[in-house]
């Protein structure tokens, strides 16, 4: 616990120096970090191999094991990501607006760093670098707490990044990692209001729930993606098939993958057998409502019946829940009840249904005739993101550099006093 406090203090102190660094100074630090990661690749892969062996011994497999794995190519991609962040414009110091009051006061809004940010995340070593780099570019220091599965990889990456900071002449306390992965230490970190200005959890539903229930530090919820694709009665079947297959199977272990398929009852008899066969051919397990099970059975397809828990579940795997709905209103009601406010899609040729879906579905990103897989900072055109916010304050959707800053009001006077 003392180690946690000491590292939090270092991060807080470093934040005071980072906030006034120039864009060139921050970019040089990021460039040094990228070079160090490439130089120390063998060491990083060696430490990652320890995590992989531990994970296999614990029975971790499939998409979860893949998310933990680092390779030479993946490390090169991480470094390419750093170079991409270097190219992004620095939001810090931007004057958003300025106006003059009748009394002569000139008031402006200026973008400034948030300060010291805590990140709690699960078994994805790339997040260690992504989070640190984005926080630094936005002028913030960062206290990282990864999952136990990736502890060797994460500690190695932070060690190497600190070497890059020192080479660039930047305070090494700008990046710290909590090596104690116990639940007790994580909960203690959630209460470090004295040192942390913001806490961002990245992971599954249980992690997000734990943070929201225990944190006294302000939190931005990210990541849980119980995403739906609703195929409306007017949908083009080929388009719908392509969107569903992509949303579910392209990368099933990410938060913007589709977890549920809703199909309008008027097309269920014709569309369901086709899409279920296509999904099963891709290795997807189907968990259907009673109507889905009945239609599939008539067509010689055996599928598992879904439980109530299935409708709430983010699988992060080749599993999908399938439900037949009576109308677009029923689809919207289902999504707003069971969804996680992340990304939702409708496939339709009906303009009014498309607009209704956009207006009434409560989510950070709502799609018409496109895959949910596009909810991503790069795909949205504003570069890397630290996560997908599923709440409405202070940020919503992909969180890029601007979302890692806040507003400061600057006021110029000439001796005005209030009467």
From Swiss-Prot:
Reaction(s) the record says it catalyses: L-glutamate 5-semialdehyde + phosphate + NADP(+) = L-glutamyl 5-phosphate + NADPH + H(+)
Record flagged with keyword Oxidoreductase: yes
Enzyme type, top EC level: oxidoreductase
A GO biological-process term: L-proline biosynthetic process
Coiled-coil portions: none
Domain of life, source organism: Bacteria
Principal subcellular localisation of the protein: cytoplasm
Cystine pairs: none
Record InterPro entries: Ald_DH/histidinol_DH (IPR016161), Ald_DH_C (IPR016163), Ald_DH_N (IPR016162), Aldehyde_DH_dom (IPR015590), G-glutamylP_reductase_CS (IPR020593), Glu-5-SA_DH (IPR012134), GPR_dom (IPR000965)
KW Isomerase (keyword) present: no
GO MF term set: glutamate-5-semialdehyde dehydrogenase activity; NADP binding
Keywords: Amino-acid biosynthesis, Cytoplasm, NADP, Oxidoreductase, Proline biosynthesis
GO cellular component: cytoplasm
Pathway: Amino-acid biosynthesis; L-proline biosynthesis; L-glutamate 5-semialdehyde from L-glutamate: step 2/2
EC number per UniProt: 1.2.1.41
Cellular compartment(s): Cytoplasm
Described purpose of this protein according to its UniProt entry: Catalyzes the NADPH-dependent reduction of L-glutamate 5-phosphate into L-glutamate 5-semialdehyde and phosphate. The product spontaneously undergoes cyclization to form 1-pyrroline-5-carboxylate.
Family, per entry: Belongs to the gamma-glutamyl phosphate reductase family.
NCBIfam families, alphabetized: PRK00197.1 (NF001221), proA (TIGR00407)
PANTHER family: DELTA-1-PYRROLINE-5-CARBOXYLATE SYNTHASE, GLUTAMATE SEMIALDEHYDE DEHYDROGENASE
Protein known as: Gamma-glutamyl phosphate reductase
Species: Caldicellulosiruptor bescii (strain ATCC BAA-1888 / DSM 6725 / KCTC 15123 / Z-1320) (Anaerocellum thermophilum)
């Amino acid at each position: 616990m003392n180690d946690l406090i000491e590292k939090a203090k270092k991060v807080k102190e470093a934040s005071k120096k980072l906030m006034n660094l120039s864009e060139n100074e921050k970019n040089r630090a990021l460039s040094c970090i990228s070079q160090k990661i490439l130089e120390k690749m063998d060491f990083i892969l060696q430490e990652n191999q320890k995590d992989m062996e531990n994970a296999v011994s614990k029975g971790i497999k499939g998409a979860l094991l893949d998310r933990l794995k680092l390779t030479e190519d993946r490390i090169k991609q991480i470094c390419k990501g750093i170079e991409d962040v270097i190219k992004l414009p620095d939001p810090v110091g931007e004057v958003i607006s300025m106006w003059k009051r009748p009394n002569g006061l000139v008031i402006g809004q200026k973008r400034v760093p948030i300060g010291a940010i805590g990140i709690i995340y699960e078994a994805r070593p790339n997040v260690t670098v992504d989070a640190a780099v984005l926080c630094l570019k936005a002028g913030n220091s960062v206290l990282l707490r990864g999952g136990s599965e990736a502890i060797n990889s994460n500690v190695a990456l932070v060690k190497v990044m600190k070497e890059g900071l020192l080479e660039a002449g930047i305070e090494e306390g700008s990046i710290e990692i909590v090596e104690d992965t116990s639940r007790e230490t994580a909960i203690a970190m959630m209460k470090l209001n004295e040192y942390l200005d913001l806490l961002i959890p990245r992971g599954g539903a249980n992690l997000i729930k734990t943070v929201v229930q225990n944190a006294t530090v302000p939190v931005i919820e990210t990541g849980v993606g119980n995403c739906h694709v609703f195929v409306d009665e007017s949908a083009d079947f080929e388009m719908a098939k392509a969107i569903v297959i992509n949303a579910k199977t392209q990368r099933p272990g990410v938060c913007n993958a589709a977890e549920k398929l809703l199909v309008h009852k008027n097309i269920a008899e014709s569309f369901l057998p086709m899409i279920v066969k296509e999904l099963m051919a891709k290795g997807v397990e189907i968990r259907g409502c009673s109507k889905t099970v009945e239609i599939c059975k008539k067509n010689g397809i055996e599928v598992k019946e879904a439980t109530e828990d299935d409708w709430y579940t983010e699988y992060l795997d080749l599993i999908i829940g399938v439900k037949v709905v009576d109308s677009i209103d029923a689809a919207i009601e289902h999504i707003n009840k069971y969804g996680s406010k992340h990304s939702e899609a409708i496939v339709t040729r009906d303009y009014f249904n498309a607009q209704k879906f956009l207006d009434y579905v409560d989510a950070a990103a709502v799609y018409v005739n496109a895959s949910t897989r596009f909810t991503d900072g790069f795909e949205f055109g504003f570069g890397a993101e630290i996560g997908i916010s599923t709440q409405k304050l202070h940020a919503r959707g992909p969180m890029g550099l601007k979302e890692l800053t806040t507003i400061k009001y600057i006021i110029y006077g000439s001796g005005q006093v209030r009467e």
